[in-house]
Amino acid sequence: MKRVALLFLVVICGMGGLGQKLKPKKRSNGEEINFRTKTKDVCTMRISGDEEMKARIECKGQGKSYWCEYTGMPLLCHPFQNNPKMYWNQITMELRKLPHACESTQMLKASMCQKAPVDALMKQVAAGVEPEDGANRDKSSQKTSASVRGAGKSSVKKTGKPAVLPRIKPTQHGQGSENETEAMKLAREHCWESLHEFCSYIIGFFRG
């Protein structure tokens, strides 16, 4: 009788241990992971959802703020079910290698789920850029207005002095030009066409 009772206890303990093994580990729903990109952008990835999960990434750095969202069903990947934390750590390691956490990739892939179906991949579904804060906008507008004023002053300085055009001396009709005209007339009347200039020169020379 004692042996039967002991055997019964062993079976119950074994079933309890089996139940603990079959019980899935705690999921990463609601977890936040902080990381930096290759260009030192400070980013936060927030994970939510149950079967279909969503990962929202928000980053700030180098005067810009941007965000993007990914959705997928990583539960279809069996290694994810056993260790979801390692899955997200692998994805974060890949994001750290990128200069831009949202523009550089359309899918989030973990090496532990390379053989998983396509639906298990986290695909980008939305992305955007946040506007600059008020201080940065004011500074940029002040710089723009200052540059416009500077350009206006420089244009006024350049166009302030009127351009001075050179004076054109009037053509003087002297005695020499009249002699040349008469000499050419005589040359045309008394010389061959090919000798007009020569005859005009000789006639002008003798007419003085």
Curated annotation (Swiss-Prot):
Signal peptide positions (record): 1-19
Main location: secreted
Keywords: Disulfide bond, Growth factor binding, Secreted, Signal
Record InterPro entries: FGF1-bd
Any one Gene Ontology BP term: cell-cell signaling
Superkingdom: Eukaryota
Family membership noted in the UniProt record: Belongs to the fibroblast growth factor-binding protein family.
Protein name: Fibroblast growth factor-binding protein 2
Source species: Gallus gallus (Chicken)
Gene, per the UniProt record: FGFBP2
